[in-house]
């Protein structure tokens, strides 16, 4: 028989840097999950991702206080900022442009995000990422 699910916890944690301090500790502690066990498992699973990159994680907590988790790819906005090497997007995106991104760079981000996107092909994925870039005040070229 399957374990009974008690709750889901959604967090964004820096890759390879999970520790018991907030936000991880309080979120898991109130559900009775072994925090250090999660931190070790998460840090080992995110070894291939750049250290410090925020990674969304969905933790499933079961009634016997055990857990499982699924990591997703880093948010598209963070990948875009990293690829064009700027600190943050525009405060008023339709008036102030903070940078530009090429079609090749969009395809690179889309290929990283493809498994988490609701897209059937690469063109659709690129359009989704281009929309994210535009909403951040980044000019899309091509």
From Swiss-Prot:
UniProt keyword annotation of Ribosomal protein present: yes
* GO BP terms: translation
Entry keyword set: Methylation, Ribonucleoprotein, Ribosomal protein, RNA-binding, rRNA-binding
Enumerate the SMART domains for this protein: RL11 (SM00649)
The record ties this protein, via InterPro entries, to: Ribosomal_uL11, Ribosomal_uL11_bac-typ, Ribosomal_uL11_C, Ribosomal_uL11_C_sf, Ribosomal_uL11_N, Ribosomal_uL11_N_sf
- Record PTM text: One or more lysine residues are methylated.
Q: Which domain of life is it from?
A: Bacteria
Annotated Gene Ontology MF terms?
large ribosomal subunit rRNA binding; structural constituent of ribosome
Q: Does the keyword rRNA-binding apply?
A: yes
One Gene Ontology cellular component term attached to this UniProt record is: cytosolic large ribosomal subunit
**Task performed by this protein:** Forms part of the ribosomal stalk which helps the ribosome interact with GTP-bound translation factors.
Query: How is the quaternary structure described?
Result: Part of the ribosomal stalk of the 50S ribosomal subunit. Interacts with L10 and the large rRNA to form the base of the stalk. L10 forms an elongated spine to which L12 dimers bind in a sequential fashion forming a multimeric L10(L12)X complex.
Family designation = Belongs to the universal ribosomal protein uL11 family.
Protein name in UniProt: Large ribosomal subunit protein uL11
Organism taxonomic ancestry = Bacteria, Pseudomonadati, Pseudomonadota, Gammaproteobacteria, Candidatus Pseudothioglobaceae
Record gene name: rplK
């Amino acid at each position: 028989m399957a374990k009974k699910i008690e709750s889901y916890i959604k967090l964004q944690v820096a890759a390879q840097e999970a520790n018991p301090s907030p936000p991880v500790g309080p979120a898991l502690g109130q559900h009775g999950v072994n925090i250090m066990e999660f931190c070790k498992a998460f840090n080992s699973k995110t070894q291939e991702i750049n250290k410090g990159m925020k990674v969304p994680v969905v933790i499933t907590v079961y009634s016997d206080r055990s857990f499982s988790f699924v990591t997703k790819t880093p948010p598209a906005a963070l990948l875009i900022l990293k690829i064009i090497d700027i600190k943050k997007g525009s405060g008023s995106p339709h008036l102030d442009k903070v940078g530009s991104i090429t079609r090749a760079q969009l395809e690179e981000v889309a290929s990283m995000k493809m498994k988490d996107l609701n897209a059937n092909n690469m063109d659709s994925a690129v359009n989704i990422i281009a929309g994210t870039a535009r909403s951040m005040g980044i000019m899309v070229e091509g």
